[in-house]
From Swiss-Prot:
Keywords: Hydrolase
Function: Involved in the hydrolysis of the beta-gamma-phosphoanhydride linkage of triphosphate-containing substrates (inorganic or nucleoside-linked). Catalyzes the hydrolysis of inorganic triphosphate (PPPi), which could be cytotoxic because of its high affinity for calcium ion, thereby interfering with calcium signaling.
Designated name of the protein: Inorganic triphosphatase
PANTHER family to which the protein is assigned, alphabetical: INORGANIC TRIPHOSPHATASE
Species this protein is from: Haemophilus influenzae (strain ATCC 51907 / DSM 11121 / KW20 / Rd)
Length: 352
């Protein structure tokens, strides 16, 4: 059978289960071209040395009803929650461990390990999807709820993916921005595959103080007028900081005053940078012809910067580490942060 290559363009939101309950009522306001409920069983494969993961690829067999598909997702471009990556699909007759021959049929690898592919983890979830007509585009909205399983470890799945099936990317941004939810939402760049690989492995807090110093050092070495590189670098770092912060429970910080100081301080450094380098956003807005979006973006930056300074004051006065991180988490999952990230993704899309 011949493999099929597709180019995905999608936005992904991590959400609370309650938002998943409210979503159908909201979508009923639009023209629904298709609606379906599915159960998707996925097994991910890799070599013992995680060769594919190191190439930022994911190989899975998906069972949808009685249909089996082998899919290779390759390393694409992820900006905050906006995903754009090629994937290669091969219909299967039986569910058997993929072979090197099948893998080479999907993608022109220069070399593959001689070892045998093996199952690493599975993702099993219910998917409710709607094909929505919006402006000049067709957008697939998929609500996934289930779990990732890696050996004895499990992690819940609760997310919405918005995939552009036809039309233009701006319609995708505009549609997602219409969502009425006020809290418990944030853009996620972590695929289910990435989460599966991390599940069960020991994770460590990043030293963001040193990471920030390295960032500023690299920035000084770059061209002073290369606003695109500066913008993409700081946005990439922000997304990593946001997702790492939300991946840990606030209880991790409960007994450690300095860890809490450093975590909130990392966001202070970030927003101080945005405050001091407004010309970067101005240049990007001009290049992307998004000048009308700039005032709201700058206003949201200032609003979040004020809230972070208030958090620092709260922590200094109360010494309550866990409550401080809970407040930070609520801010990162808030409506103002959600809208701000959409505007940043609009500026970043399709830039080198």
């Amino acid at each position: 059978m011949e493999n099929i290559m597709l180019q995905e363009i999608e936005l992904k939101l991590a959400i609370s289960p309650q938002i998943g309950i409210e979503l159908p009522q909201y979508l009923a306001k639009f023209t629904i071209l298709e609606h379906q409920n599915l159960f998707l069983g996925n097994t991910y494969y890799d070599y013992p040395d995680h060769f594919l993961a190191k190439q930022k690829m994911g190989l899975r067999i998906r069972q949808e009803d009685q249909e089996l598909t082998l899919t290779l997702k390759t390393n694409g471009k992820v900006v905050s929650g906006l995903h754009s990556r090629p994937e290669y699909n091969l219909p299967l007759i039986e569910k058997e461990t993929p072979t090197n021959a099948q893998l080479r049929g999907l993608y022109p690898f220069e070399q593959l390990p001689s070892s045998t592919l093996q199952p690493i983890f599975s993702t099993d979830f219910n998917r409710t999807f709607w094909l929505v007509e919006f402006q000049q585009s067709k957008i697939e909205v998929a609500f996934d709820q289930g779990k990732i399983i890696a050996g004895e470890y499990e992690q819940p799945i609760s997310e919405i993916e918005f995939e552009l099936k036809s039309g233009n990317v701006q319609d995708l941004f505009d549609f997602v921005e219409t969502l009425p939810f006020e809290r418990d939402i944030y853009f996620s760049s972590a695929s289910k595959a990435k989460r599966g690989y991390l599940l069960g492995s020991k994770q460590f807090l990043t030293d963001w103080l040193n990471k920030w110093r390295d960032f500023l050092k690299e920035e000084r070495e770059e061209s002073a007028v290369d606003f695109c590189a500066k913008f993409n670098a700081v946005l990439k770092m922000e997304q990593k900081l946001l997702e790492e912060t939300l991946s840990f429970s606030p209880t991790l910080f409960s007994q450690d005053f300095m860890k809490t100081v450093e975590r909130v301080g990392a966001f202070f450094n970030l927003y101080h940078y945005y405050d001091e380098n407004g010309k970067i956003l101005e240049a990007m807005a001009t290049e992307k012809q998004k000048e009308t979006r700039l005032p709201a973006l700058l206003e949201s930056n200032q609003k979040i910067f004020v809230e972070i300074r208030d958090l620092i004051r709260f922590h200094s006065e109360t010494k309550d580490n866990e409550k401080t991180i809970e407040k930070l988490t609520a801010l990162l999952k808030s409506r103002v942060y959600f809208e701000r990230m959409i505007k940043l993704m609009e500026l970043s899309y399709d830039l080198g």
